[in-house]
Amino acid sequence: MAGSLSSAIFNVLKYSGMASLAVTLIALGFLYKYQKTLVYPSAFPQGSRENVPTPKEFNMEYERIELRTRDKVTLDSYLMLQSESPESRPTLLYFHANAGNMGHRLPIARVFYSALNMNVFIISYRGYGKSTGSPSEAGLKIDSQTALEYLMEHPICSKTKIVVYGQSIGGAVAIALTAKNQDRISALILENTFTSIKDMIPTVFPYGGSIISRFCTEIWSSQDEIRKIKKLPVLFLSGEKDEIVPPPQMVLLFGLCGSAKKKFHSFPKCTHNDTCLGDGYFQVIADFLAENDINTPAS
């Protein structure tokens, strides 16, 4: 009888193990197929693909521009130029955080525009807001390059100093773009961004993260790209209570950055999404721009 019981238990464990393996494989298959939806939740919050606030709602004059990428995607974007002598002011190229669209970031853009007197150019990535296409790492890299090239060909912005600003996944976009275009960019500002998508997986999936990471096709290897940035000033802004991107990843990126003009500032009380509300946030940025002579006209 004992032998029969042992055999029964063995069979239960065997089939339980097989069931667990099957569930794991199904989960991995789901993640592999839908990981772009998980990495780029462009439809969240509800209505984000249809409803895009405009700068006029925030008392900013603007031009809406549709950019065409080399792979035939149309990007929705806003350009806000200073009303007086815009050619003498720096231009902010803004890459927003995940979810939502560029319109949701206009309250932040307004501070850069009104308080720091910067021209501001912001895009909705492909698959976000009213931009066409579907988001991917390769696609967002094309989008960012398209945006920079537009500024470099613009009759006013081409005469200004370009400051690239990226939040969260926008930081990864900003790092990749800057690493390739250091002679065209005057400064880089990063907020709460990560070392790589693979490094983020254990935070999102604490169990089985090492296995799941092997199936990850969206890489965003910022820890490799940041090493290449040596020619321009870089400002790192980190919320110490960030619950999405572990703050040590920002510290690591700072350490790996090859620039001699890098600066790190942390905000002890801030989480992932409210760091820009931290005490002195925009003053830190203003001081950084002044220290690196960014507020003067481009030569």
From Swiss-Prot:
GO terms for molecular function: palmitoyl-(protein) hydrolase activity. The chain crosses the membrane at residues 15-32. InterPro entries: AB_hydrolase_1, AB_hydrolase_fold. Keywords: Membrane, Transmembrane, Transmembrane helix. SUPFAM superfamilies: alpha/beta-Hydrolases. One of its GO terms (cellular component) is membrane. It is found in: Membrane. It comes from the Eukaryota. Belongs to the serine esterase family. Suppressor of bem1/bud5. This is Protein bem46. It comes from Schizosaccharomyces pombe (strain 972 / ATCC 24843) (Fission yeast). The lineage of its organism: Eukaryota, Fungi, Dikarya, Ascomycota, Taphrinomycotina. The gene is bem46.
